[in-house]
Amino acid sequence: MTKNELKILYYLFKHAGKICSRNDIVDFLWDNQLYVDDNALSVNITRIRDKLAAIGLVDFIKTKHRQGYTL
């Protein structure tokens, strides 16, 4: 996994059982940079899901519509 993918997983584990908003994850991951493409987080989440599915962890990261992500 890439550094950013690991940071996303770390953040989700740190807040396990809670819904993590996209904004909170983006702020943590990219340290409040002025501009981050809206699609950047989605791409990283998709890549993490694909890698986890390859080892049998399907649906490990759940999307909560209009709220964010949770484990």
Please report, for each region that a protein language model flagged, where it lies by residue.
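Minor-groove-contacting beta-hairpin "wing" of winged helix-turn-helix DNA-binding domains
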Residues: 60-71
